[in-house]
């Protein structure tokens, strides 16, 4: 939590602050060990934090999601030790986090791109997870860089996230429009 507070400002990550930080190295190493959860929010917070830490670690290792091949290496090929197994960021998102049935995760996990959700300057915590995810969702939906409404044509221009994960938003609210 202190590391995020010191190195994340308004969603902008100070990657050098993580590079040689012993606390960050210890946290990433700890992620490799099997995990136990006291409930759904504990599990969600753990996996969101793990995803974001591994996404940062990928950038620090020189992986870059800025090209098609770079995205494939970053999300689908690089395996990370997590909770007693090796897993890609893609599989962590699609096979572990998404099946937990919480669409707000799409506003919490980062993809190291300016078009993706901001990284919070605090860790996700089980006891405050709902409030944190609500805040992330509000910020993302109301961010004019990611979403905007043209009053003249009465047209909403939404982030691609709403298209990519439409089934998650529909499952939660019946439609993406109702979700928003």
Regions found by a protein language model. Name each.
Residues 1-180:
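Interaction/scaffold regions that mediate signaling and macromolecular assembly across diverse proteins
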């Amino acid at each position: 939590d202190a590391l995020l507070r010191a190195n994340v400002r308004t969603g902008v990550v100070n990657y050098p602050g993580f590079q040689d930080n012993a606390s960050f190295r210890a946290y990433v190493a700890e992620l490799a060990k099997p995990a136990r959860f006291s409930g759904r929010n504990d599990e969600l917070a753990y996996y969101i934090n793990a995803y974001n830490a591994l996404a940062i670690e990928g950038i620090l290792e020189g992986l870059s999601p800025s090209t098609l091949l770079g995205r494939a290496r970053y999300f689908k090929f690089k395996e990370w030790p997590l909770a007693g197994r090796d897993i890609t960021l893609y599989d962590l998102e699609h096979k572990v986090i998404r099946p937990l049935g919480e669409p707000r995760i799409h506003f919490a996990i980062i993809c190291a791109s300016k078009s993706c959700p901001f990284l919070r300057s605090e860790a996700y915590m089980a006891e405050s997870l709902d409030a944190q995810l609500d805040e992330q969702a509000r910020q993302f939906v109301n961010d004019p860089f990611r979403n905007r409404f043209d009053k003249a044509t009465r047209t909403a221009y939404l982030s691609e996230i709403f298209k990519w994960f439409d089934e998650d938003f529909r499952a939660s609210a019946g439609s993406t429009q109702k979700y928003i």
